[in-house]
Amino acid sequence: MHRNARGNVPGPSSLRQSIGTTKADRDRDRVPSVDAGAPRTPDTTTSSSTTRHMHHQPHPRNGRQERKCTVTVNESFSRDEVLLNLDLFDNGIKPGSLMAIEVPPEKSGHASLRKMPTQDHLDRDDSSMDASQTGSTTTTDRRYLFIVKDMSKDMKLRHPKVELYVAKHVAEAFGMKKGGHVYLIPEDANNPSIEASHVELSFRDQYLSRADMWRMAVGELSERTVYQGQVIYFLGTCKAQISAVFVDGRKVRSAFFGRHTRPIYRSESARYILFIQMSREMWDFDSDGSGEIMFNKVVNGFLPALFKKWMALKLKHLVSIVLFARVEYDTGISTEFAETALHDSYFTGTQKSGSKRPYKDFYRVVVSEKTSVEWTSILYHLKREFGIFRRDISLHHQQALNPMQSVSEEGATKQPYHRQIRAESSLATHGNFLEAINLASTVYAHDYIDRDLMRTGISVVVISPGAGVFEVDYEELRRTTEALVGNGIGIDLICVPKIPLHSVPLFRYKKVPEKGRRHSEKIKTHFHDGSTPKYHTPAIGSYTSALGSSLSPTKNMSVPPRVESSLMSHASNDEWSYALPQWLHVSYWTGNSDEALSYQGIALSASDNTCQDSQDEFAIRCRMYDLQMRSVLETNEIETTPLHADPSFPRKLIQPLPLAKFRRFDVDGITLIPNLRHTGGLVDHVSGFQKFAPDKHAKPGEKTIWRHLQEYDDTKAHLPASRRHLGFRPQNNADNVRMHGVESGSYLGASMISERRVSINHHQSPHPSVSSKTSSGKTPKFMRQISLGQRGFGIAAPKVAVAEVQVENVAAATSMAAVSGSRSPLPVRMTPIKSNPQTSQSPQALTAIRDSPIAERAQESGRSSRLAPSRPIHIRNNVQSSDSTLFGTVGTMISSSVIRHAGAAPDAPEIKYSNALRAEDAQKVGISKLRAGEMPDQQAILSPSAAVSPWLTVLNPCNPEANKVDETNLYSRWQHVFPQPSEMKVMKWKSLCTPAAVPLTTEHFPTQAQFDSEYQRQPYNVSQEFDDELTEEPKTREELLKELISLRFSQGFQVVVGQAVAKAFGQKQMKIADILSRDHSAEDGTSIFLSVGNTIHQLSCVNGTEVEVNIFTRKPALQASNLEQPEVYKPAIRTIMDEDYVARQIDIATPKPERNWNYIDSYVAGHDLELSESFRFWRARFVLIPIVNRTSLDPAAGEKEEETRIEGTRRLGKLWQKHRYIPPSDRRFQDLGPRHRKDPNPLDIVYKTDDPSVVIAAELETLPLLEGLEAGHRRAQLVTNKHQFRKSSLNLAQLAEAIQQPVENGGVRMQNRRWHLRLHYNCFIGSDMIDWMLDNFEDLDSREEAEALGNVLMISDEDKLKDKEKDKDKEKDKDKEKEGSTRRESGIFVHVEKRHRFKDGQYFYQISSDFAKPQPSTWFNQRWREASVPSTPISEQPPRESIRNSISHTLSEEESLTSGATTPTAPILPYGGNKPRVMLSKVMKYDVDHRKRSYRPERIDLHYDRLHNPDNCYHLRIDWMNVTAKLIEDAVEGWAREASLYGMRLVEVPIAEACTISDVNPFRKPFPIKLAVPPPDRQPVTFYDPTSFSPLAQPARLFYQKAILRKFDFVLDMESASSFPSNVDVTYSWGKPEFKYTQYIHRSGILLAEITDEGDFLILANRLYSNRAQAARDKEMRKEEEQQQHKHRQGGAGAGGNGGLPGHSHVADLTPLSSPLFRAVNTTGSPKTAGQGAAGAGSHGNNIAPGGEHNVHSALIKFSLDEPNSIRLEMEKFCHDPVALEAFYSELLDRAPGPQPASSIMAPTIISQTGSGTGPVADHNIPSFPSGGLPQGLLSSSVAGDGLSVIPSPVQQRVQSPAVLAASQLLRRGSVQY
């Protein structure tokens, strides 16, 4: 059943709702029905439709082959949805064939079926389907399609009598009952009635790139049956649900997903930004409706309805709401002096029309990225802001201009001038509508940076009190259009008033004069009220409103010819154009129902099939008082129906002549081309006749024009007997060939061919086009133009095209074979056209137009498409003389185009061409007064009109015509989102609830004329990288092509389908690959076209293995010289935390740099390239934030929190190392080590207890990160004894000797190592020893075995006891010698504090004194110049820039210009050279698909820290291109789960620092906090040198500010670039340090903080924090914390074991957000002493800052449960309290102890004898942590962790003195040095 036979079908809403049938639908109507038996060729696409039409309805049941079967429901899980026992069926059913299951209706007679649990959710907003779609439930709603699959033999044995085996979820969805009867019906897969035209899928809580969508459609949907409610799993992890299935616009339950099916993806977890235009009308009353204030309609009507919809559908959107307005200022003086008298820097600009007042734009952020569940608080904030918004923006200029104005001398009696300025909000029409959209596009223009892996989709909704008409600036419109057509942002406009009577949305802009045109060329022509533009017409759809005339252009049409030049040149200054944008879609809030939005895309007259009510029951709306008093005028010019639009008008008078009757005459050298254009009616002159004599030249037997007109008048004079409604009748004159000439003083320009198929006609007969061929092989100088039909879009007046060709121009495919009749499907390779300066006086170029073979074949083909001749277009370089082209006056056209041959006679007799003029006169009946526009010169840049023409449909809004709106152009990118034609006037909420992604396909493609003249080409070839034998299984060319397509999908490209491509290349058919087919082959000659914005990519398979890429780029737009649009936009923005509006300068004019696609494609092809910024690759940064664990993984091990975090980092490193991808080129080096390094050391992270800048400044010589020290590959050198060791035969002496060899000789690195304040001499770390043993033992295969062997080599506890006994029994020399030998056989090394066994990790060990080599006498004060080189995986190399610029690791001889007080400077080493380069991070290739779920490589670049302080954040960064995002999210969630087990929280944070957020998002700004009292100059002594034993005074900057941040639980995130030594080249694997300020992050991860150079704080919420995996864990942790808090309060632990410190153990135990910096260290029982002791931690980072009376405890509990604003308010309160600050400063100074004797603690010993019962040990391997954060079993353990000092028991804590505590607090260094 044809869709047009149905009534008006109100279809479901969509984000981009079409206005009529699509071009594909109309094309389908003309395509013959598809033969069911015809073979399917997925790799060949003709110029026919892309979506097949439903030509057949299913036959009646009694006429089909069907079988009644009994259903058996499979209750268990099964991958197969339907199985058949083919042994019980005849041979007619084959596996793989398509069948349908029809469920008979229920006995009650009702066809309602039982829905799945999710069905209500899917159908909730599909309630307006009419009866034609929902009535036939027996064949539609209860009909399930499936592909036949036979049961297995085992199942047949178990269930021999089962015929039909159906999965449970399918049975429930379609109402199949166990044991019930259904009908099996064979189906044909090629039948269009069962192939889905659109399939809609919804998903949430994940980021799906468009490349993932394409792969999901091909992998899980293509060539399969689908049904509503079906859940799709792609790669086992990407989940989506089919929410709707459409067959030819009809909603069905099940269908077949074929090659023409278009998938639509909708996100249920997107980002929404709502703009509310607070124009003057927002405070007006709704006089036409309810009478309430407009804003109340928004906040009480629309928004609650929207949020309730979201809640009902359980959507998870993030919402931001911005109020915006434009304030105009009445200065009281003339406009010329307004900006100069005042300060023009304050104003944003000046209105270009109307009052021309200066104005300023305001933006108020009310809500910033709140979840949609908080909609009640959102509405509260909106209502509160409404009360003060108008006041704030109206009075802002008084405060802003006050310091700029000077009071006059009479100031005592006269007010300042700025107070006399009257500020008033502008009307919605003159508001900052485009500017707001432009700002929104800049917010999401860089969504590939800081990629949120939890959300997909961006939608911008603008709510306006206007009617949808906006007066804009042309340059702003062009810039916004170019920005929006290249991204996937959807813009929805919601208007509050009623629907207007004209087309909307409408942009009204002033005409931009063409650059460099003569005065005569600037004459603009007038257009009929239905006229709309072509691409090349500068006066597109314009009409004059000058001199106060009517908006209708026809009143100026009576100006005599050649008289109106001056008038029109003056009128052109005020000429306006009206345009419908394809990227903006409008709805109207009626307020009558929560269920509907009135929709208006184009005026109702533009609908091709409007309903009867809209025509007969016209609702009169008029707000003009005079017209209300006089009643509405019955007739006016706009409402009068044009004569030829009357159904009874003789159509054939205005239809084009057939090809056979298309007369041409060549008389005396003059070629006459009949003008088939409809000329202007009343003032068009007919050349050749002195008087109108229609019958003079009539042929015998032919009815004259006069007879036709007489019959028409007679018909109209008699009233019909009965009135009947005549609907839309398709016309057959759409493909008229219109040609006209131009005047010239010397010779006439070339005639142009202009034709365009009408876009909405459903039936059109093919009409041949007039083509040409050259006589001498040279191509004529012709330019094609496009006309959009008979009425409304106008005809372009031609002129000879001239251009300065500076780049390669695109020519249509030159195909001589096509001219000669060849039908080769391959496009001819395009070659650049080299233009030479020449004139166009060649007679060959002006040959008469003749019929071409293409035109003849076009007549036979049955296509109504535009067929262009296969010839290139040559462009001349010379600039044509001004007299060569001159436009005639308005309404005057030469009747025929006369092309003069060289030397032809200037005049010709009238009788010679009267027959030609007779055909011309037939086209000159009194029809609609069409005018012609001028055609601009073809230049290297586009004219202003051509720049926006593809994306803006320009027309007369008051009377657009139905057959002139081509939605392929109007909704080019969003066309395939619309499953149904929008004949309804009510849309639903789908677009506002679930925004759709940009479709994968489009039919929009430039015409051949545009393609030839407006595009330039860049070709290159891409081939797969084959690296000899090292390459893994090479990709095929098909796989490479898929990767190239996938990459472009993710960058916003769409695949061009349909006939437009073949048309543009002048061919009937092209070999186009089918991207939605599973088994399409990439043969030579196959092409794929992809487009985005003004860029087109053609991917072609060539040369057997290569892919040729042709990039077609549209020429840049012409920048008009008279534009005064500033390059910098200057609005006033008030963010959510600002107190007032702040003037901002935003660059919205600079375009984004173009990508280097050649480089990108080479990267995808496998060439060893690095990601660069031009790639626009996806990236995200994560930090592991230390938190306080409540339990340990292994309580028996006695590990503490810092030790646990180090272990967690090591475990993550092992995980990364396990799934690390090693390129084949590096694999050969990886195999050089002994036994190929079976178990490499994970990442070799260097752990320090200082910040990176301090470590680099103090320990540069021994730092193992210097570039150049790692190139030697330590493991390539083995021990010097030429053989390896074995576990079975160990010689400890030889082993100890080998271990202590120098590193270059194969030994283990021994060096002095500092942990906090203790310096351990000549020690090694456990991980280095594990690596060494794996290299030098033959029978060790894993790190676990090496660790076990290390414990064997450790000195045991029994040996320690024996040592003490032997020392007491010295007289037994014999026994002593015997025991000594036993000891030597038991172990060779020991832990530096004799507290732990041997472990793999950051644990310090020393060779025992029995085996240790003696050190030189001067070693004590020597700085070891050896650099420790941990075992880094061999293939991990620094970036190529580092390799290319590798330099010596010596320090620079240049003097540092930076003071040591601000930037630490590394000591100058004795050897000279350039700056040493320190790499603080490494990068590896990580495989996120280690389970091999994907068919393609899924690898990312993982950057990780090499230098880490366990008290700070550990940094990760991931970069990727062309990787499935859900696999990345799964990997990140796995890392987060692993890290949470070891006391760390994985949080995503912005890559850029907090102070630069406004550069990316103008609606966000860090909140500044100033200190009420400046810090004192005096500071505690806190700096220690690694080789000194006494504290050194260093003027640490911002010491007190950092202490305040620690007080509020912030930890170090990233240091500023100035923090590092200036004489060291510090780099990361991703680039140089770029932070201006040092950044900190709250332990919760929800807040960032920076300290400025002035000592102020900048606070910014981390909006990237959204951790779905941790939400449940955090809730569980908080519940546990509450229980522990209750237990502690009952037990009184706060005053006993914890010293009564506020926020100490309570906070550490209660919240995972609390910091180790808040803990007390071994406090005494006295609360007073404890409070003083805790205060000292401000300088060392161990404890909470002073202020026992300040309730930090309660504040921190609030922080963990509330939003970031709570932390900010608490911190702001503290910083603004002078008393609290003074107390804080004084306690920090008073509690800082003096230097302690270094010898008592820092004595140089080989093995420390410090016991656990002698008090706090400050010098230890791993720092101590608060007792409250550890299990009770660990508090009494004497062995608390490897390398850690033991936490004393509560008894030991009570006996310690305050002096000992103060000393311990001082000596333990914090994570941040001051």
Swiss-Prot record:
Bias class Gly residues marks the residues at 1691-1702
* Bias (Basic residues) ranges: 52-62
Gene3D superfamilies per record: Winged helix-like DNA-binding domain superfamily/Winged helix DNA-binding domain
What segments bear the compositional bias annotation Basic and acidic residues? Answer: 23-32, 117-127, 1671-1685
Q: SUPFAM superfamilies this protein is in? A: Winged helix' DNA-binding domain
- Record's GO cellular component terms: GATOR1 complex; vacuolar membrane
Coiled-coil stretches are none
Is Membrane among this UniProt entry's keywords? yes
Give an example GO biological process: positive regulation of autophagy
Task: Indicate how the chain sits in the lipid bilayer.
Answer: Peripheral membrane protein
The residues covered by the DEP domain are 1304-1383
**Subcellular locations according to the entry:** Vacuole membrane
Q: Name one Pfam family in it.
A: DEPDC5_CTD
Q: What is this protein called?
A: Vacuolar membrane-associated protein IML1
The UniProt gene name for this protein comes to IML1
